[in-house]
Amino acid sequence: MGPRTNHRQSKTLLVLTLLGLLGAVGAAIANEPQETAPMGHNQSQPPPLVQENKTIKVSEHVYAIPDGRVNLVPNIGIIVGSRATLIVDAGMGPRNGQTVVRELAKVSKNTDLYFTTTHFHPEHMTGVQAFPANTIVIRPEAQQEEVDRKQPEFIHNFSQRTADLKALLQDVKPRPPDILFDHEAKLDLGGVTVRLVWLGPAHTRGDNNIFVVEDGVLFTGDVVINRFFPIFPDADASGKNWLSILDQLDEFHPRTIVPGHGEVGDASLISKERTYLKAVQSRVVELKAQGKSSEETAQLLLVEFRAKYPDWENPGWIADAAKRFYIEAK
């Protein structure tokens, strides 16, 4: 399937090549855990605000606004070429998007702007409303399908959780994409090549992996996070595919990983995520073979893996991972 574009593409100095290189991955099966909001937040925690004046230089062409380990704040990327700039994720709602725009102005003077999202969850996507009107939005078709099918419900559910979230998401308006791609898009920002790659369902159905070729920097979204337990938020998350995708991310040979949440790190973040998920998968298979129910398995693993990973945050997601692998186990 080729790209879908509108007239705004004619204004760009960016060269876009769409590559149908990777086979689509099958959908997650039915009878799944209940949909829940990712990266828990309650009123006792800091409000999920993108940090101002904290932007770091990750590599020659890449900057990141770190999340400060605040739930529902993503790591945000700014990739600067000689002709155009690509922004990766936007924070929750227009207020956070305005912060991103101010930080962007400190590191790039380009007026040609592109925006992509690692996945559809509100803290990654809804800040784009505050971006300049000429910003070109690009994302995978699989991700847009999730936006259309799920995002209104996610925004509503987030808004009901705390006063902070309700205020941030008030009057949020969807920003439709200008470019959709099926499996891969390649962007030339001017001396900087960026690959946007959809590999199939993992954390969500539409996870978008962004690789800055010259700098060896990989933005993984929530497919890889640093010292947070991996999040299985709804019926489209797939443990089996997630493990396969981690293997494929290794093939990029990244030097630096900008995870969806948590500190920027090196390629070892991929192997750490893999080690955890494989351990959960293996233990689930063992307990299911012993006749344990899904709920019994989830509660046993919650205790076991909290003890094994005492410095990882949001342990409530252990049970959801266990239930996912239980469904997938033969």
Q: What are the residue ranges of the model-derived segments?
A:
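Bacterial N-terminal signal peptides that target proteins for export
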Residues: 2-16
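Metallo-beta-lactamase
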Residues: 50, 57, 84-86, 90-94, 145-279, ...
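Accessory terminal helices/loops
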Residues: 22, 28-45, 251-253, 264-330
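Zn-dependent metallo-beta-lactamase
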Residues: 16-22, 26-83
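Divalent metal-coordination and catalytic microenvironments
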Residues: 61, 79, 89, 104, ...
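Active-site metal-binding motif and surrounding structural segment of the metallo-beta-lactamase
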Residues: 82-86, 94-139
